[in-house]
Amino acid sequence: MSNYDRVPCSIAIPNQQVEIQQQPRVFEDQESPVKTKVQQPPPEQVRVPPTVIGATATAKKKSCLSTTSSRKEPPAHPALRRKTVAFGRTVNVSQTVEGTSRHTKKAIASPSQNHRMTEENQEENWRDVMKNEFEVMRKEMQEEATKKQEELNAQNLNKMQEMMSQFFQQITVAKPSAEESQDREKENWYEQSRHARQQKPANKIAKAREIIKREGSIPPEALPILEQRIRTDPMFRQQIDNVLADAECDANRAAYSPLPPLSPPSGRYANGSSGNPALMRETLTVERSIRYDNGLSSIDSRQWTSERNDNRTHDNYRPYEPDPQLQSMYQKGQSVSYYPSEAVGKAHRNNRLEYHVEEVPEYEEEETEVGGRGRGRKYHEPMETESAAERERRIREKYSRRK
């Protein structure tokens, strides 16, 4: 007995045989003629509803349009399927009524859908569990780090307090008595004397350095100190090398530097306040003026100077000792002057290939000029004077030629 028999106000329709005649169709849009024979339904039968129990009263009601009869399977061939118009186009009846109802689709898809939903729910639950675990672990780690930092801060604070207390104890020390101050002054004096004694070797080294730089040799009293410092101090070894190199450079520079004058300066120019000795160079004798090589000295003077420089090469490293003053060999009426020759090809004065000798007699030497533009010219010779008229005439002729 079906459930519809128990439900009140239900219509029970017996199974009726329906004949369906189907024919193959040429066009799909045209439906084949169907002849259906329907039997007349029997008269309605009203049944008294039985006693309803709690389970049947709470049962879910089904639609009155649903049927308990099994549906007929649609034909396999698409040409034999029934056609209808749905949603503006022609579709198979099986797609709308027979095989595509929501109930059928839901019944077919429910197992897989339930399984998929179950898996998704399990994954979401697993994510929630992991998230909660991570949150708990993170909070625990933060609490541990905070606790360690607080302990470290407390230790640092204690140490700082101890240091400050010790510092204040050192500051608040009682003032020493007079006896202690005297003892401390004595200790300071002894320390200063000891420090001075320790500084003495440094002073010796400084003196030895000056001697090395001046004489180019190491004094014997400085050798033990230098040996000890050289063995123990690499920087001192470098300093010694630098000092020796400087001494060698100074010696080489002194070898090529010009030598001082042979005779000491006179008392007139000793203080340097009365005048410049260079301005009085013309008054010096030949022997004293050999150091002033200005191109005007004679041949024998230059030769004697070069020979003397060659002979003094062994005196470069000895302190300078002035030579004894030489007496002038000048004799009146016996002087000979050498001048460059200008007769051959108008040679320059510095061209010393040819020279000529001019002998001046004794009675004319007093009337000869010593320097200036008129060297060698006699005073008794008349000077050629030009009057103003001659000068004007010469200038007029000069400009008339240019025109």
Curated annotation (Swiss-Prot):
Transmembrane segments: none annotated. The keyword Chloroplast does not apply. InterPro entries: Sas-5-like_implico. Residues 360-369 have a biased composition (Acidic residues). Keywords: Cell cycle, Coiled coil, Cytoplasm, Cytoskeleton, Developmental protein. It holds the Pfam family Sas-5-like_implico. GO terms for biological process: centriole replication. Residues 128-163 form a coiled coil. Residues 116-127, 177-194, 305-321, 379-403 have a biased composition (Basic and acidic residues). GO terms for cellular component: centriole; cytoplasm. Residues 24-79, 96-127, 174-205, 255-276, 302-325, 355-403 are annotated as: Disordered. Disulfide bonds: none annotated. The keyword Cell membrane does not apply. It is found in: Cytoplasm; Cytoplasm, Cytoskeleton, Microtubule organizing center, Centrosome, Centriole. Interacts with sas-6 via its coiled coil domain. Required for centrosome duplication. Essential for daughter-centriole formation. Requires both maternal and partenal expression, suggesting that it regulates centriole duplication during both spermatogenesis and early embryogenesis. This is Spindle assembly abnormal protein 5. It comes from Caenorhabditis briggsae. The lineage of its organism: Eukaryota, Metazoa, Ecdysozoa, Nematoda, Chromadorea. The gene is sas-5.
